[in-house]
Amino acid sequence: MNALIDNPEALASGYLAMAQVFSYPDAGAWSRLTERGLVDPALTHETLEAEYLAAFEMGGGKATVSLYEGQNRPDLGRDGILQELLRFYEFFDAQLSEDDREYPDHLVTELEFLAWLCLQEHAAVRDGRDAEPFRRAARDFLDRHLAAWLPEFRRRLEATDSAYAQYGPALGELVEAHRSRLGEQAPQLGELQ
């Protein structure tokens, strides 16, 4: 995957694809996922929805995998994480959707914000403006947030027998590719402890 993601526009597309994958799979979302080749059409909407609920919400007798940073990093306290995320979003005038019920620390929200930063970087380069503030913000956001909790999230997700387990490695590769592009000597997120 790393060879394919060498520019901010491609990274944004990758983050948005992962955001779609980890969003609740209602019928419309399932159609978009199958049309874009992100989900095998043989996996019916009903099955994908049941897999989502079992993996992330109800567990079906097993522990669920939380999609929230604050629940994956209890040592830091969720309130502090939420406040820091809101400051990140406010600094860049990134508004959370009034219709969206997700919290600022939801995986999908964080993925969408990273996609937005990548698109801002792309626009700055295209327009001859300084793109470095967007690169620094993405580096900082990854270090402080997504890359900090992704290894544990992946470990738990990949330990499930859910259809969603297959997306953990792809998400890890995307984040590694982005951090590498930003010049980070990132620990390998794929090497789970």
Swiss-Prot record:
Family, per entry: Belongs to the type II DMSO reductase enzyme chaperone family.
Keywords assigned by UniProt, alphabetized: Chaperone, Cytoplasm
One Pfam family of this chain: Nitrate_red_del
Protein name: Selenate reductase assembly chaperone protein
Keyword Metal-binding annotated: no
Gene Ontology CC annotations of this record: cytoplasm
SUPFAM superfamilies xrefs: TorD-like
Compartments it resides in: Cytoplasm
Organism encoding this protein: Thauera selenatis
Main location: cytoplasm
Name of the encoding gene: serD
Cystine pairings recorded for this chain: none
Biological function: May function as a system-specific chaperone protein essential for the assembly of an active selenate reductase SerABC.
Signal peptide annotation: none
